[in-house]
Design a protein with these regions (language model features):
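Terminal signal-anchor or tail-anchor transmembrane helices
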Residues: 10-20, 34-60
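N-terminal, positively charged, Ser/Thr/Ala/Gly-biased leader segments
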Residues: 53-144
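General beta-strand structural signal in soluble alpha/beta enzymes
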Residues: 97-99, 142-145, 152, 186-188, ...
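Phosphate/pyrophosphate- and phosphate-bearing ligand-binding catalytic cores of soluble enzymes
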Residues: 98, 146, 150, 242-366, ...
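Solvent-exposed alpha-helices and their adjacent loops that cap or buttress functional pockets
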Residues: 109-112, 135-136, 143-144, 151-155, ...
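Structural signature of FAD isoalloxazine-binding scaffolds in flavoprotein oxidoreductases
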Residues: 112, 118-124, 151-170, 222-253, ...
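A generic, well-ordered mixed alpha/beta core segment in the N-terminal half of proteins
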Residues: 163, 169, 177-212
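A gly/ser-rich beta-alpha-beta helix-loop segment of oxidoreductase catalytic cores
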Residues: 193-237, 243, 308
């Protein structure tokens, strides 16, 4: 039994035994009220020890996780923390460094506990130094763009979150090759929507389909995002990356190893800092119409008012058939745990109805995975990246 189930039981019991004032006024029998109080007292006595037991169990899991984290990463929080922070403050200005920053503020899922360190570097040089520092202390790090396609643990992230976003990583340079062809150099922190609109204003075609994909250029390339079959990869020429060793490399599109909903860049943990695209001159009215149609389609099918991380699973319709049909047969449409639900109007999405948790998301994900394997022998592969420890499992 988890906290959510226990909470639901308590709420149901309260609904049964607790009456409003008007109801109590109408009950003149004092013995009836006494029996009601006695039942409530007995239930409380029984349930409180169970709640305390589960709480202790959960706290032990967190302690075990922290101990494992220190031993596996050789980062001693008592000894190395102050020293690491001092060196981090040399690299970054005060407004670029945050401690215990809530990740729910930085993800489209609106879920996530505090990151030990949250940094917003403004130069490639700073990023390199931060990575080298993390390597020196063997402290894990994760690179964040717009926070889409990401689920962060409720207890947070015991490492460094590096956000590549904002004006310093949104530079745009347009080079005219000839009358019909243009080269676009863009920073990895520019939102895909912004680049799509800029291209339209210049009457350049090739990036219409990313107009309403949340996320930055860097994240979009690494995850190889697309809408209706096309995305950034169609016009991509090359990228500039920082390797896990802190070195800068230039890679061609082929070297990026792009595949459906992923890339070699993701597998190798490369950080994209710049990208080069080739776009063609087009009719601005046609480009604008395509973008408008894309926006209408996305608003019809996708949860615009709930927190989500986009499509949660990678699904091959050609190989596996209709996902909706399988969900319908398995009673998974609108399946809900707490404040997390499979979106009714597009079952590819798992949405946060308000105060959802990462634990609730994983509970749904594990249930879907189990059902799809047992009933259809299909291995469900996550598209969304999960970081931190959830329900005792360390994801990243």
């Amino acid at each position: 039994m988890n906290f959510l189930k226990l909470k639901n039981i308590i709420l149901k019991l309260e609904n049964i035994i607790i009456f409003n004032k008007e109801t109590l006024k109408n009950k003149n029998n004092s013995s009836y009220i006494f029996r009601l109080s006695k039942i409530k007292f007995l239930l409380t006595v029984c349930l409180i020890p169970i709640f305390i037991f589960l709480l202790k169990k959960k706290m032990n899991k967190i302690k075990i996780y922290k101990n494992n984290y220190v031993s596996n990463n050789t980062f001693n929080y008592l000894k190395d923390d102050n020293e690491f922070l001092k060196k981090l403050k040399i690299i970054l200005k005060e407004e670029e460094l945050f401690e215990n920053e809530l990740m729910s503020k930085h993800t489209t899922f609106r879920i996530g506990g505090p990151a030990k360190y949250f940094v917003k570097p403004k130069t490639i040089k700073q990023i390199k130094k931060i990575i080298n520092l993390c390597n020196e202390y063997n402290l894990k790090y994760f690179v964040l763009g717009n926070g889409s396609n990401l689920l962060v643990s409720d207890i947070g992230y015991l490492g460094v979150i590096i956000q590549i976003k904002g004006d310093n990583f949104s530079n745009l340079k347009v080079i005219k090759d000839d009358e019909n062809n243009y080269t676009i150099l863009v920073g990895a922190g520019m939102p895909m929507r912004a680049l799509s609109i800029e291209s339209c204003l210049l009457s350049l075609t090739g990036l219409e389909d990313v107009v309403d994909i949340p996320g930055t250029i860097g994240g979009g390339i690494i995850m190889n995002v697309s809408f209706r079959g096309t995305g950034l990869s169609k016009s991509l020429i090359k990228v500039k990356v920082i390797t896990p060793e802190g070195k800068i490399k230039e890679l061609s599109k082929k070297e990026c190893g792009l595949y459906h909903r992923g890339s070699k860049l993701k597998d190798m943990k490369y950080i994209v800092v710049e990208a080069v695209f080739k776009l063609k001159k087009g009719d601005q009215m046609i480009i604008q119409k395509t973008m408008t149609d894309n926006t209408k389609n996305r608003y019809k099918k996708q949860p615009m008012y709930f927190g989500s991380a986009g499509c949660f699973f990678i699904w091959n319709h050609t190989e596996n058939g209709s996902l909706y049909k399988k969900y319908k047969e398995s009673n998974l449409v609108s399946y809900r745990v707490g404040n997390i639900m499979i979106y009714t109007y597009n079952i590819s999405f798992i949405v946060n109805l308000g105060k959802g948790t990462a634990s609730e998301v994983i509970e749904i994900v594990e249930y879907i995975t189990k059902i799809m394997k047992e009933k259809y022998n299909i291995e469900m592969k996550r598209e969304v990246i999960v970081i931190g420890t959830i329900n005792g499992i360390d994801y990243f």
